[in-house]
């Protein structure tokens, strides 16, 4: 089984799920990690990386995938100061290469990272899940930020892309992004990638961009990685084997017109990292994240996994957002990153993969 199963871990003191817990989940070999206290634009120092490496290696895991080294806003906006932050990013790549890192997941979304309107939405069976209610996403970004910050303040839990430091300067950020059109954002992404590709080759590290979540413009901000055409443009814009994708089935399938399995088959050789997430759609455009089992949503998890299997996928894969189960809830669990549903998702994914392996063996006779 060539694919490598990973688990996103937020670090000691920052994640209720311990490395000891993860060690007990069959099939997990890789910890997907980051230095979550580092702000975009800062250099990840050797001693900081070493501390996390020692923790991960003590449990026999590899640390091949980083999610994420965030891109500074000056790079996305295209300010004259961007070159300084690009140099810092290059140094991060060099430092990470000393620890065997092979893939850096990142995104190029303006201001916000992922966006949801309810972090613990009841789904009817006693569990909760991340939920997106389209009517709540108006032009008033402050109410959305206030909602996320209420969890940060009450439970002392920060969320990637919604850090208090960023939320404190939202008005300033929106003003800075005001002149940035979608085409300008594409230009700035290309500039960034062309600048770092030589370093990626030097260090043998693939840059793997995550699709925009959700895959449409919000709060008047442009989004780039939203559909198959955008992915085609991205990969041809910088046609380099180190310019890759973190293909997120859930982010893309928030728009039911996106056929994730087709995208996998077309670009499998440029997918370095796969996120497997299931989505349940509502007729009004709302969506709720669902269990990984195929019939629990409309992503087509079996067809997505079949596409990876048929392509001989040898990259890294992890269960993406799961539901919060049993005693998990606000204060005891990161929204979407509970222990139980992701562990269940892994076993489902591995079961599908094992069956596909068996079917291939039977065909060979």
Describe every region a protein language model picked out.
Residues 34-50, 219:
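Glycine-rich, proline-tolerant flexible connector loops at the mouths of alpha/beta enzymes
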Residues 111-188:
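Extended, charge-rich helix/loop segments that form flexible
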Residues 1-6, 11-13, 54-57, 74-78, ...:
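Histidine-acidic metal/acid-base catalytic patches
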Residues 11-36, 55-59, 95-104:
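Catalytic domains of carbohydrate-active enzymes, especially glycoside hydrolases
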Residues 45-68, 85:
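An N-terminal, globular interaction/scaffold subdomain
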Residues 36-37, 70, 110-111, 214, ...:
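Conserved beta-strand edge residues that scaffold enzyme active sites
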Residues 65-99, 103-122, 127, 134-145:
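Acidic/aromatic-lined carbohydrate-recognition and catalytic surfaces
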